[in-house]
């Protein structure tokens, strides 16, 4: 679902495509606080933000505390590589460090789950809660973060 947006810079008209993205958000360390902080940052980085509810899930493949997980659907004129770089930068700004995950601590996890309807991170889509979150996002998206 690409739409064109026109940007005029010093009299030069540049066409940029608008892309629809879905971002997976998760945290198992002070999750309510960290998800809210991530949400505040993501709403400044992307447009037309719609949120699924956030749900608590048990960790898979980690010995850790439960996770708080949710999805964000948004629009951007950035390409896929730029979105991924922006998400990794956001994780760092929000306090994620390379050693944390090895220790079972996930301050924040931001994954590009879909770009223009094409799924990414296929393994993550296999988690049962992802289907629940996507259904909720499609049925009744929220304009604000709803933490259950």
Regions found by a protein language model. Give the residues of each.
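Short, surface-exposed acidic-centric catalytic microdomains
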Residues: 36-79
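Extreme N-terminal starter segment of soluble prokaryotic enzymes
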Residues: 18-22
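Short, surface-exposed loop and linker segments with low hydrophobicity and enrichment for Pro/Ser/Thr
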Residues: 12-16, 28, 63-64
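N-terminal amphipathic/basic-hydrophobic helices that include classical n-h-c signal peptides
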Residues: 1-16
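Flexible, gly/pro- and Lys/Arg-enriched active-site loops
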Residues: 60-67, 81-84, 89-148
